[in-house]
Amino acid sequence: MELILNSLISDDLTEEQKRLSLDFLQDILQSNTKDYESYFSSRAVPGSITEDIAEIDAELSALDRKIRKTLLDNTSQIIGNILENDDRAQLDDIAKSLEQLWELDTNINKAADRNVTNDDINNESVSIDDFLEDDKEDNDTGRIMTTESNNLARKKKEDEFHKALSRLRNRISTKEDDKDDIRSDTLVTVLENLDSITDLMELPFLARTCIRTGHYQEAVMLYTHTTSLRSRFPGSTIVDEVCEKVLNEISTTMLSGLVKLLSTNVSVNSLKKILQYLNSIPPFDGKTNKSLLSVFLAMRYKFITDEIASYPLDVESSNESLIEMMVKRKIEVLREHVYMSLNVFLKSFLYDTNDLEIPFPEELESTVLRINGTNEEKEIEEKEKETKKEEYQKQDSVANNEEDVTENKSIEDVQEEVQGKVEGEDDGAERKTENEIENETVNKTEDKAEKEKEEEVNTKDNKAEKEEEEINKVEVTPEEPSKSIDNKAEKEEEEINKVEVTPEEPSKKIRTSKRENKIPTNAVMLQFVDKCITYVLKDLTRGLNSIKLSDSVCLQLVYCSFRLCDLNRNYHHLFLKKINDTSLFTTEQLARAIDKRAELASKYIYS
C-alpha cells in the first residue's frame, strides 16, 4: 500500500509535504468509518470526496482573497520597493554584452565572406581540374555541393542571430529614454484591477463547480457571460483562453451529464428543463432542433426499452394472472412514457413536418363496420321492445284502475243489499247476528275477487300470445343484415354514378381527398413510435410463445393506441396496423376492443 501511495506522490515535494500527503491518503483509503462507494461518489453527497474537494477549494480561494487584500492594502509599499531598485547597472551590463556579441557577429560575417571568396577560388580550380581530369568529376562535384550547402546554412543562421541582436539593441535604446516608467504603469494597472482579473480567471473553475453540483442554470449563465466577453474583447488572448476552458467544461461534462439524465425516469418538468439547457449550449444551439430531437428520442427509447425489459415474462405458464399483470405493466410503460416524451417536445420546440397519411387497416375497418351494423340493429330491436313494454304497462295500469273501480262498486252494492235486507226483515233480525252478516258479505266479495282474477289471467295469457306473434314478425333472418348493407352500398354506388365527371375530374377529386386526409407528421417522431411499438410486440410474442392473451389486454393496447391518437392520427393507425399484423389477437378481438372503446369515447373516428 505504501509503495502505491509513494508512486502517486510527486518527487518535487519536501519530506514534510510527502508525510502529510501519505497520512491524508491512508486516512481516506483505509478508513473503517467511511463507505468506499458513497465517499468516492461523483455527486455532491454529504461526506463524499466531492464535498471535501469543494471545501478545500473554498479554503484556497479564501487564502487567495486574503493575499490579494494584503497586496492591495500595501500597494504603495510594494511599488516603492520595486522602484527603489535601480536596474541601470544591469542594463549597462546587458548593453556591454550586446556590444561584444555585435563584434562577434561582425567578425563571423567577415570570416564567412573570406570563406566565400576562398570557396570561389577553389571552385575555379576545381573547374580547371575537371576540364583537365575527367576521371575526378564525381568527387569534385560532391565536394562543391556540400560546401555550398554549408555556406548557405551558416549564412541563414547568422542572419537570424543578427536579427535577434538588432531587435534587442533597438528595444534597449528605446527604453533608455523613460527608465523611470519601466514596469510602473503596467504593475499599477494590474494591481488596481486585480479583483476583476481574478474573477475572470476563476470563471472556468466556477463553471466546473456549478456543473458538478447540479446547478446547470448557473453554468449556462456563465457560458453566455464568457461569450459576451469574447465579443467585447475580440483581441484578448486571456479572454479567449477563459472562454475555451468554460466551453470545454460545458461541452464535455455538462453535455454528457444532461444526455445521461434523459435516459432515466425523470418527471415532465425535469425533461423540459433538461431540453432547455441542451438547447442553449453547443452543439444544439443552432437554428434547427433536428439534432436535439434525434438525441432526445434515442435516449428516451433506451429508457423505455429498459423499463419494458424490467418486467419479465419468464414465469410459470399456470400463473396466468401474474403473466397478464406483467403484460399490462409493459403496455402501461409504453403508453405513459411515449406520450410524455413526444408531448414535451411538441409543446416546447419547433420541428419539421411533412404531410403524411397512414391509412386505417382495411380488414379491421370492415370488421368494425360489420360489428357496428349488428350493434345498431340490436339497439333498434331493443328500443322497439322497450316501447312495446311501455305500451303494455300503460294498458295494464288502465285495466287495473278499471278493475279497482268495479271492485269498489261491487262492495258498495253488497253493503246496500245487506242494509236493505236488515231493514226489511225485522222478524229475522233476532236470529241473525252481526257476525253472520259480515261473513256473508266477505264470502260474496271473495267469490267476486276470484272470478276477476281468473279473468285477468286469461287476458294476460292472450296478451303474451299476441306479443310473441308480433316479435316473431319483427325478427330478421341472418341474411337480412347483409342484404341491408349491400343495399346501402348499391345506393351509394348509384349516387356516385349519377354524378357526371369528366375524364380529368376523377383524378383531381381523388388527389384532393388524399390531401385532405394527410396531416403534418415528423418523420423522426414517427420512427420513434414505430420502434417502441415493434419492441413491445416482439417482446410479447417472444415471451408468451403459445399463451393466449385475454380481451382485457387487447383493450388496453387499444387504449394505448387511442392515447397516441391525441397527438397524431398516424400514430394511432400505425399502432393498430402493427397489432393486426401480429398473431397475438384476431381481427375480431381487435374490432370488439375498438368498439368497446368507442362506447366510452364516441369522439374518436376510425378511418
From Swiss-Prot:
Keywords: Golgi apparatus, Membrane, Phosphoprotein, Protein transport, Transport. It is a peripheral membrane protein. Residues 375-394, 406-466, 480-491, 505-514 have a biased composition (Basic and acidic residues). It comes from the Eukaryota. Its main location: Golgi. One of its GO terms (cellular component) is Golgi transport complex. One of its GO terms (biological process) is cytoplasm to vacuole targeting by the Cvt pathway. Transmembrane segments: none annotated. Belongs to the COG8 family. Present with 6440 molecules/cell in log phase SD medium. This is Conserved oligomeric Golgi complex subunit 8.
